[in-house]
Amino acid sequence: MSFVTTQPEALSSAATALGGIGLSFSAQNAAASAPTTGVVPAAADEVSALTAAQFAAHAQLYQVVAAQAAAIHEQFVNTLATSSGSYAATEAANAAAAG
């Protein structure tokens, strides 16, 4: 027989804290989007234009990857919160059954 020991309150607290971190991460990425994707060439020459375009392309790729990371993070937070509730309900049911 296997036993699982959890602390649903700790899981819930961790989910809340991680949710806040995710919101902060998303806000910072949104704030950085315009200045990093809209890089203006330093001069009117071809090299400056290509360099600015390269920086902008890199920033756009970063925004795509950051959006994927935010989605994975949100799924993790939701799973953690759901698991916390499930463990708490199971603990309550076991306590009621044990009397």
Language-model features and meaning:
Residues 1-99:
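A glycine-centric feature that highlights glycine-enriched low-complexity/repetitive segments
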